[in-house]
Amino acid sequence: MTRTVLVLNSGSSSVKYAVLEPDSGVLIADGIVERIGQEGGAHDHAAAMRGVFDSLAADGHHLEDLGLVAVGHRVVHGGPDLYRPTIVDETVIDRLKELGPLAPLHNPPAVLGIEVARDALPDLPHVAVFDTAFFHDLPAAAATYAIDAEVARDWNIRRYGFHGTSHQYVSEQAAAFLDVPLESLSQIVLHLGNGASVSAIVGGRPVETSMGLTPMEGLVMGTRSGDVDPGVIFYLWREAGMPVEDIESMLNRRSGVRGLGGEIDFRELHRRIESGDDAAELAYEVYIHRLRKYIGAYLAILGSADVITFTAGVGENDAVVRRDALTGLAAFGIEIDEHLNDSPGRGARRISADGAPTTVLVIPTDEELAIARACTGVLGARPGDG
């Protein structure tokens, strides 16, 4: 029987799932159970997990017939010591709970999802795959914050980076698409979704990334501010009397493109700009300005880029964002072919002009497949496993 992996991404109000064949890359089934704890939705995560199984069965995919060999769990933050795909046991769960404050929006529901899934599928190995893992070995100059060294050491404060599963997968796919060794490439990967990050990768290893201790640092995102002067936080706390929890919520949920323009759907944002909406236009300009700022910084770090790749929802589907991000960079060897960029397409594709020194690609990310393959990789490495 073909072996498969169930991949789960458990959030506070939803559970996304996918069943894949890691060897072939075939997606057997996927879906999402939403509105957990809300009216009309699943009562709790245990009910949501039953909803996953019910949805699979309704599509003719019964658990006992799927050939499942593992359950893979996306976990956003692995902290300083969880940086490889890890088989989950009680010790790992306890450690993940300790790491909750580093990713308060993401880690606690992920842990809850792991616990529920282990109860539901106790005979399968459960593997945690961490967004931070790819960036564990960032150069010290990139990973270190210029704060009191003793405080940073005592509290494990460093730049961890996120979306690592996506950045690694896309950088490897770029090399495969170009049919050149990964080790030979200097790359910039732009993961542009509701959450957004950029990485600089040399020879398959990251040398810089935009997110830091938490997923709040870096680019302007759908609802997150990205880079902000820490003084803003102190000012709002002292002068506006805002509790720290309210400031954190604002920076996570009511900032970014939504905070400036009241909208996170870029299709609607473009429509509003065309209709003369000043707030939407400013939100977009701030978003693009920050994106170009990071691209320029990473070009300086790399010296030059062999490949720049766009991925995730906005990166894969918004030709205007891609054009505006790279306009005027011909002096750096970066030119987009307008026709290729504007042409709808599926799968990996080149959008750079013929003869341009830097190849610009659009590559769909597939974090679920990467997680599934990470699961079978760690299982295959266990003593006694084939």
Curated annotation (Swiss-Prot):
It comes from the Bacteria. One of its GO terms (molecular function) is magnesium ion binding. ATP binds at K16, H191, L192, G193, N194, G195, D265, F266, R267, G313, V314, G315, E316, N317. Mg(2+) binds at N9, E367. InterPro entries: Ac/propionate_kinase (IPR004372), Aliphatic_acid_kin_short-chain (IPR000890), Aliphatic_acid_kinase_CS (IPR023865), ATPase_NBD (IPR043129). Substrate binds at R74. It is found in: Cytoplasm. The record marks H163, R224 as: Transition state stabilizer. Its EC number is 2.7.2.1. The active site is at D131 (proton donor/acceptor). Keywords: ATP-binding, Cytoplasm, Kinase, Magnesium, Metal-binding, Nucleotide-binding, Transferase. It catalyses: acetate + ATP = acetyl phosphate + ADP. It holds the Pfam family Acetate_kinase. The keyword Transferase applies. Its cofactor is Mg(2+); Mn(2+). One of its GO terms (cellular component) is cytoplasm. Mg(2+). Can also accept Mn(2+). PROSITE patterns: ACETATE_KINASE_1 (PS01075), ACETATE_KINASE_2 (PS01076). GO terms for biological process: acetate metabolic process; acetyl-CoA biosynthetic process. PANTHER family: ACETATE KINASE, ACETATE KINASE-RELATED. This is Acetate kinase.
